[in-house]
Amino acid sequence: FAGSEGLSIRDLRFILKLMVWLNTTSTGDREEIRLTNADQRLWERVCGRSGDDCYNRESDCFFRQARVKASESEILVVNHALLLANSQASGSLLPEYKYLVIDEAHHLESEATRQFGARVSRWEIFANLDRYLDTQGPFARIAVLVLSQAGSLLRDTLSPAVVTSSRDALDLVRGGLTAWFKSLSDLIQEPLSQKKSRGSDSVRIDDRVRDLPAWGLFMQQLDDLYVNASTALVQIRDLNDKLESAVDAGTIVSTPWISDLGICIQEVHDLFVFLSELVSHPRKDVVYWVTLDAAGEGVTVLESAPLEVSGLLQEKLYQDLESVVMTGATLTIQGEFDAMRDRLGFADAEEVVEQSPFNYKKNVLLVTPSDMPPIDSPKYEQALGDVEIG
């Protein structure tokens, strides 16, 4: 990434921030560095998701270091997000374990709903596609690589023209997605205008939306786009296979740009699997909705979430464990665990309620200051700081 040409000022600022942070961090933890929304999009280009996507295997990799350290530990302490991400990744992120204690278990349902659902950002889709299609992107770099390194015998099957054809096929998909998002934004204007609550710019994709007269044409538009995407994926897979064969044969050298093709294939495939489900094959146990940009730029986010996560937690998290213990201060309603049992898929568990040793009447003081500025006042933070310091 840092070696790419044509980096913007924003890219360079992010790289400088990253370099300063890398000199101080020992863990590589995302929570240690403060990122803006724009930075977060760039972070996705450099972060590790499995430890297997590090281009330089001999370099320090925080992910692999953490995994080695975890494998040598007898007790692991992780947050709900990592615990569930591990279950989604078939246990590849954490060492194998048989005993699990979940503290603050009343938060598990909301995190499971988020992780077992899906979220697709329009900005992220086009940022990724533009990165692949850029004049300094992987297709352009690979075309130069093939021209300079591939022998004459190989150029009949692996030529710059083959690379360019794959890039053009992906560019056609990008253009189709632009038109598709515009159609979706136009389509949901009617249900958006009928919403009783105007405080939200989100619209659920339900039967009311699917029964709109324009929905059939909208589905056909996605079907046509899917054909173009399938064609592009076939070409890019073929190109990727030829490049990997050439690398194995020693005809060309391996570069991160070739690895990028594999990532591109997976991203485009996953995107169209989600779009197909949302538009053409919705599941009855899943809720789908879209969010519009407040500045009037149309639909910016597509999301889905399971209606309930108890079965998914049982299948993905609990079933292979010998013991699961859940603790929390608010697991009961009127002293009963029934509601939480149902929501967390914990029907057969033993239970115990321990009274809190904390003496609220003696140890808690509720103070309402009368001389504070309103919470939306520019002076509020300074006044709050003065009170805390005092």
Model-found features: residue ranges?
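A substrate-engagement module of RecA-like helicase motors
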Residues: 1-74, 132-134, 141-156, 160-168
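Conserved phosphoryl-transfer catalytic core
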Residues: 2, 106, 110-202
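Charged, amphipathic alpha-helical oligomerization/scaffolding segments
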Residues: 72, 100, 131, 165, ...
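A contiguous, basic/glycine-rich beta-loop/short-helix subdomain that forms a polymer-engagement track
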Residues: 40-76, 80, 84-91, 229-372, ...
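Short, conserved "post-DEAD/DEAH" coupling segment immediately C-terminal to helicase motif II
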Residues: 89-95, 113-126, 311-319
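Long, low-complexity or tandemly repetitive, helically biased scaffold regions used
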Residues: 162, 193-217, 230, 234-251
